[in-house]
Amino acid sequence: MSAQFEPVWRALQKKVDSGWAPGLVAGIRHGGTTEYFATGVRTLGQPGKMRTDTPFRIASLGKPVAGALAASMIADGTLAPDDPADVWLPELAYPRVLTSPDAPLERTVPAERDITVRHLLTLTHGMGAIFDSTPLARAMAEAGIAPDPIPPAMTPDEFMHRLAGLPLEHQPGTRWSYHTGSDLLSVLLARAGAGPLRQILAERVTGPLGMDGTGFFADPAELPTAYRPGPDGLEVLDAPDGVFSHAPAFESLGGGLVSTVPDYMAFLTALEGDALLPAEQRRHMTSDQLNDLQREGLAEMVGPGVSWGWQVAVDTEGREPWRAPGGYGWTGGTGTTAYVNPSAGFIGVLFTQRLMAGPRENFNYFWEPLAAAL
């Protein structure tokens, strides 16, 4: 390891020593070289250590992978951004829209336009995470299709059936709403590719990039315990032999992917060059694709200075020392984060097994010392 990033590794070690999380793995790429750091254990009270190649549940860091997979299919003509989504998702045909976000479910009007592939890519199709207790929020939770760190416990067809029975919160194309569009995109990609999503992902992304540790489940002997913060300390969210230890019914790139830090670093490194996508599709994916009205939904969740490309956040301002306009990345609710800063020439990836306490929790304990080191 170089001395340059020693302060970063010390900061991460201090975080683990404090009991914040049992362990973590990080990677930094700068100046054409990559360094990794692993510390702590995979499960509290057990000796198994974190390793550089330890697999993690990466939650919403699967979304940029979905964006890249979709961009690949757009590049070869399998999809086009303005295709109606109901070509592959007939359950989305003729949607109804609530007269207001908090209206009763029966108070709807027809959608003013079709839902398109672009709407799913940019999370503007009209439905997603709802942070207020509205009739639609309650109905999504009761149906088992509300955003959650654990993927839907049903087949994609059943997910689509349940979702089709509910109205949209907003007119398609008018507002950014988190997550649900990513699950819909996952179903669409599998249907458009005429195969299981795992197979299409392997053919187009993980196979060519040698991402052997990335998939929809992992060996329970290698998988860390996932924890969430509770009133008396860390509580188990998912055990090593839990949900992510076997093939799921729903293969979701919105929140169901398992990966390693080196694999994810390989993905982002390829995304920065020409190894994964043609320049045009890469530019669309990693640049601002929202208008001012759509962006209001994103600003409510993450604040100003950030917009959205194809399944990934993009910086329109550089509001922290490690950020810059044109930078892109995202976080995962299970405690993962990744960011690419093309102007400063670095990529950072950090995987932990501790669930984020909320959308405002950050990873500044990693990014701040990294910015200082650079």
Labelled PLM ranges:
Residues 36, 95-325:
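Short, surface-exposed loop or secondary-structure junction motifs
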Residues 35-37, 338-341, 345-354:
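Short, well-ordered beta-strand elements
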Residues 86-95:
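Acidic helix-start/capping segments at beta-turn-to-alpha-helix junctions
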Residues 22-24, 56, 196, 334-337:
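Short loop/turn microsegments at loop-to-beta-strand junctions
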Residues 6-13, 32, 57-85, 182-190, ...:
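Active-site SXXK
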Residues 273, 286-297, 357-374:
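Short, gly/Ser/Thr-rich active-site loops of penicillin-recognizing serine hydrolases
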Residues 2-58, 78-80, 97-106, 364, ...:
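Short, conserved catalytic-motif segment at the N-terminal edge
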Residues 249-256, 327-339, 352-358:
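Glycine-rich phosphate/pyrophosphate-binding beta-alpha loops
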